[in-house]
């Protein structure tokens, strides 16, 4: 049983080493038709996170 766990550990270490040394794609292919209206960054849209409104809701629930 000890030998099996050592072999599994060695395989995991080797695969992790190979994964860490893998080179990322230099120029990944762009999306075929990206949506210009899609906003991937929620912080870029000021209406996406209404922190003041959230604080008011939490305060009203606590009182």
Swiss-Prot record:
Signal peptide extent: 1-22
Propeptide: 23-48
Tissue: Expressed by the venom gland.
GO MF term set: toxin activity
GO annotation, cellular component aspect: extracellular region; membrane; other organism cell membrane
Keyword DNA damage: no
UniProt AXPX repeat ranges: 22-25, 26-29, 32-35, 40-43, 44-47
Cell location: Secreted; Target cell membrane
Superkingdom per UniProt: Eukaryota
Family of the protein in this entry: Belongs to the MCD family. Eumenitin subfamily.
Function text: Antimicrobial peptide with activities against the fungi B.cinerea (MIC=5 uM) and C.albicans (MIC=100 uM), the Gram-negative bacterium E.coli (MIC=25 uM) and the Gram-positive bacterium S.aureus (MIC=100 uM). Shows cytolytic activity against insect cell lines. Has no hemolytic activity against human erythrocytes. In vivo, peptide injection in the vicinity of the head and thorax of lepidopteran larvae induces feeding disorder followed by death due to starvation.
Name of the protein: Eumenitin VP1
Source organism per UniProt: Eumenes pomiformis
């Amino acid at each position: 049983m000890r030998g099996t766990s050592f072999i599994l550990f060695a395989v995991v270490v080797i695969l992790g080493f190979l994964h860490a040394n893998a080179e990322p794609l230099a120029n990944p292919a762009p999306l075929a038709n990206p949506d210009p209206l899609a906003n991937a960054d929620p912080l870029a849209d000021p209406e996406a996170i209404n922190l003041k409104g959230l604080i008011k809701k939490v305060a009203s629930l606590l009182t």
